[in-house]
Every structure is written in structure tokens, then in C-alpha cells.
Amino acid sequence: QTCALPMMGFAVVPFAPGMMIIDVNIGLLFFLGMTSLAVYSVLLGGLASNNKYALLGGLRSAAQMVSYEVFMGLSLIGVVMMSGSFSLVDIVEAQTDVWFCFSQILGLIVFIIAGIAESHRLPFDLPEAEHELTAGFHTEYGGMKFAMFMLGEYLGLMLISCMIVTLFF
């Protein structure tokens, strides 16, 4: 993932009352859209390295990201139905009495698993696992280019963590 997409995803996260970059009525869909666009950076990263192993690693990572994106979206249906809105501010305000993690425990578990898979962490790091011959789609990258891929992955992990807290707690 590049750094720009997770940073754009942070734009709709309400950190405190009135403390967000932008409040849109479809903040949840914006978040899902930004995580879906990260697939292109993985594909282009594997393709741009001009290495067949990096391309195969990029294709495997992209297939994994697309497949878990469906479960991530489906796990949020209960949250949207209980809050009645796609706005993250409205979702947080709907949890003033009771958190959604109690009534939507299955959605929370599915969202956590899909978030871990989206961020390429154990046990879902198959394209970059220890038993692989190459390091996935960033085989040919080093220095600052590799650091930007890693920074994007860790920003995506932080964004998923912020969304878990925003949507369920």
C-alpha cells in the first residue's frame, strides 16, 4: 500500500467531537473505498519491479485483499442497520447507550479477521511468509521505496484499529 490511501482514510475518522478532517455522510463507504483502492498499489508495485516473482507476489496479495474486502463490508451491515447511517459521527453517537461490540459480536470478530488479512499480518501474510522464496511484491524494492511500502502497511494497520474502535466501541 502506498501512504496516501491510508492517510486519506484517516480523513473521515472522528477522533473526538468535532476533531476530524472532514465529516461526510458516507464516511463508512469512503473508508471501504480507500481500502479497496489499495489493491492497485499492490498490483502496480509488483508490476513495476519488472520481476516475475514480484508480479506473482503482487497478484497473490491483490487476490487476498479483494477476497477479504467482501467480508469486511458484510461485517458492517449490522452496524449500519443499528445506527441508521453511513456517517461515522452518527455511528459513534448511536453507541452512547451501549457499544455495538456487545450486540454485533460476530461482526466485530469478522471485521478484526478481515482487517488483519487486509494489513498482511500473521497468519495472513502468505505472499511474504517465511516459507516463500521471495518477499512478495516488494522483492526488488530497497531503501526509501521499501520504507514507503512498509509505512503504508503500518498506516493501514492503524486505520483498521481506529475503525474497530469507532465502529464497535
In which residue ranges do the predicted regions lie?
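Selective transmembrane helix interface/packing segments
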Residues: 1-169
